[in-house]
Curated annotation (Swiss-Prot):
Subunit comment: Homotrimers. Interacts with LAMA3, ITGB2, ACTB, ACTN4, SVIL, MPP3, HSPA1, HSPCB, HSPA8, PIK230 and PTPRB. Interacts (via C-terminus) with EMP2. Interacts with isoform B; this interaction potentiates P2RX7 responses.
Catalytic reaction equation(s): Ca(2+)(in) = Ca(2+)(out); K(+)(in) = K(+)(out); Na(+)(in) = Na(+)(out)
Disulfide bonds: C119-C168, C129-C152, C135-C162, C216-C226, C260-C269
Domain remarks: Contains two P2RX7-specific cytoplasmic domains, the C-cysteines (C-cys) anchor and the cytoplasmic ballast. Palmitoylation of the cytoplasmic C-cys anchor prevents receptor desensitization. The cytoplasmic ballast contains a zinc ion complex and a guanosine nucleotide binding site.
The protein, known as: P2X purinoceptor 7
Sequence positions that bind Zn(2+): C479, C499, C506, C572
Organism: Homo sapiens (Human)
Higher taxonomy: Eukaryota, Metazoa, Chordata, Craniata, Vertebrata
GO CC annotation, single: presynapse
Length: 595
């Protein structure tokens, strides 16, 4: 974008120039892309509700667990094992937890009658000893239950362990009971109350419907909106067995997903429940499998404080609430439409890729000559020429050369390094199509002798014999009319150029060269055409006419204005023009790069 230099530059608008190609194949490709993209954009707009402004849910959760369990516990009293029956209600097997979680006890181990005194440690690899030297007074092992006294005492039979100051007797290391003591907790139910709020949309609701049947139980298909869940059903949904998990405990996630459409015409805001096991199922390889913790019941007996230590195994239920609430918003709709408009450009990118590929030199040289089916693709070269304009960087070394006996133009973009320009190969570029509209503006003198149909001047010229080489003609001259350059030695190679690549007649002998380049009447007409009030005095007439003749030849032989700016005139043409419109002092500066 050009810089603004004045106030009028502010009130401008720029747009791209496009090329319209009338092609059944490319038209079909374009509409195929547009239909696919339009279908996808509409589908995503409706299915994902991308026209809505969405807001994350804010929620609070409250739970109530109900159920009664009968526990058969085996205890040892006076050396005799007894089976004790007890009943556990909600207060016995639930524990208060922070956040959106609740805990249900399913198994436990008891150590009764503990009091603070000295006693031997429970025998383990760490606590076994044979003498007092194996125990360190005051040592507190993180895995131990107390502080060592430095004595090694008898635990039972021949086993000796370090004596500790702790709650005695020390808790035994033993496995959780199998089956779980509260195996009937599978039939417990939990009521989940979930209130949600979307403050941005000023909308609040909850998961309990107004006419809820309090005797309902959640079922994935038959009763998916019931907020009362049976614990065994939760594990069944995840593919786990409640009885197996109840032995050592675990962690279960209850997911509540709210996908709320708050638009009046499609209002819907109901929760969707799902379940996920959150702890490690592979208890055999876990370092600490399951879920457990300890708590104590304190009491006094004979004025001595005692406690019953209980190691609790159970299931922690984490309630995870997430979701969004969306409502129609015109800004979101405009943003979405604007972001998808660029997708329609994929058709242009793909078609441009096909045109560029099928018009490449590789296809032209290696594919089209051998593949008959691919020959219709040659039309892409025409499309490419109409679509793209190749521009060469205007370096000081850029030069264009045109030989009358070649159909193409040669581009030389390198330093000559003393070599004659006639001998430099260069790169072949197509000759631009001639625009004959400007010829209609020339004076009628140019058309004095009507050409013979089918026999252009240049074709007649190539059939003539070469002009005999003069004694002054350089070795690189092919037409016999070139003269040595007057430039210094370092720049002389730039003017060592003939109008022909191979021996033949000189272009200066053609009738068209005389009428178009050397005709003083035509050149004066062109100068006045550009500047109607131009005063052609005697001193500047030859200079203006000479440079106008240079430009006429360059435009005639090179066609493109860009090429004409970097065109090098053959020595024969340059000296013929200089002879017709000479310089008074006879010294000429030669070619100068316009950039």
């Amino acid at each position: 974008m050009p810089a603004c230099c004045s106030c009028s530059d502010v009130f401008q608008y720029e747009t791209n120039k496009v090329t319209r190609i009338q092609s059944m194949n490319y038209g079909t490709i374009k509409w195929f892309f547009h239909v696919i993209i339009f279908s996808y954009v509409c589908f995503a707009l409706v299915s994902d509700k991308l026209y809505q402004r969405k807001e994350p849910v804010i929620s609070s959760v409250h739970t109530k667990v109900k159920g009664i369990a009968e526990v058969k516990e085996e205890i040892v009293e006076n050396g005799v094992k007894k089976l004790v029956h007890s009943v556990f209600d909600t207060a016995d097997y639930t524990f208060p937890l922070q956040g959106n979680s609740f805990f249900v006890m399913t198994n436990f181990l008891k150590t009764e009658g503990q009091e603070q005194r000295l006693c031997p440690e429970y025998p383990t690899r760490r606590t076994l000893c044979s003498s007092d030297r194996g125990c360190k007074k005051g040592w507190m092992d993180p895995q131990s239950k107390g502080i060592q006294t430095g004595r090694c005492v008898v635990y039972e039979g021949n086993q000796k362990t370090c004596e500790v100051s702790a709650w005695c007797p020390i808790e035994a290391v033993e496995e959780a009971p199998r089956p779980a003591l509260l195996n009937s907790a599978e039939n417990f139910t939990v009521l989940i109350k979930n209130n949600i709020d979307f403050p941005g949309h000023n909308y609040t609701t909850r998961n309990i419907l107004p006419g809820l049947n309090i005797t309902c139980t959640f079922h994935k298909t038959q009763n998916p909106q019931c907020p009362i869940f049976r614990l065994g059903d939760i594990f069944r949904e995840t593919g786990d067995n409640f009885s197996d998990v109840a032995i050592q405990g675990g962690i279960m996630g209850i997911e509540i997903y709210w996908d709320c459409n708050l638009d009046r015409w499609f209002h819907h805001c109901r929760p969707k429940y799902s379940f996920r096991r959150l702890d490690d199922k592979t208890t055999n390889v876990s370092l600490y499998p399951g879920y457990n913790f300890r708590y104590a019941k304190y009491y006094k007996e004979n004025n001595v404080e005692k406690r019953t230590l209980i190691k609790v195994f159970g299931i922690r239920f984490d309630i995870l609430v997430f979701g969004t609430g969306g409502k129609f918003d015109i800004i979101q709709l405009v943003v979405y439409i604007g972001s998808t408009l660029s997708y329609f450009g994929l058709a242009a990118v793909f078609i441009d890729f096909l045109i560029d590929t099928y018009s490449s030199n590789c296809c032209r040289s290696h594919i089209y000559p051998w593949c008959k089916c691919c020959q219709p693709c040659v039309v892409n070269e025409y499309y490419y020429r109409k679509k793209c304009e190749s521009i060469v960087e205007p370096k000081p070394t850029l030069k264009y050369v045109s030989f009358v006996d070649e159909s193409h133009i040669r581009m030389v973009n390198q330093q000559l390094l003393g070599r004659s320009l006639q001998d430099v190969k260069g790169q072949e570029v197509p000759r631009p199509a001639m625009d004959f509209t400007d010829l209609s503006r020339l004076p009628l003198a140019l058309h004095d002798t009507p050409p013979i149909p089918g026999q252009p001047e240049e074709i007649q010229l190539l059939r003539k014999e070469a002009t005999p080489r003069s004694r002054d003609s350089p070795v690189w001259c092919q037409c016999g009319s070139c003269l040595p350059s007057q430039l210094p030695e370092s720049h002389r190679c730039l003017e060592e150029l003939c109008c022909r690549k191979k021996p033949g007649a000189c272009i200066t002998t053609s009738e068209l060269f005389r009428k178009l380049v050397l005709s003083r009447h035509v050149l004066q007409f062109l100068l006045l055409y550009q500047e109607p009030l131009l005063a052609l005095d005697v001193d500047s007439t030859n200079s203006r006419l000479r440079h106008c003749a240079y430009r006429c030849y360059a435009t005639w032989r090179f066609g493109s204005q860009d090429m004409a700016d970097f065109a090098i005139l053959p020595s024969c043409c340059r000296w013929r023009i200089r002879k017709e419109f000479p310089k008074s002092e006879g010294q000429y500066s030669g070619f100068k790069s316009p950039y």
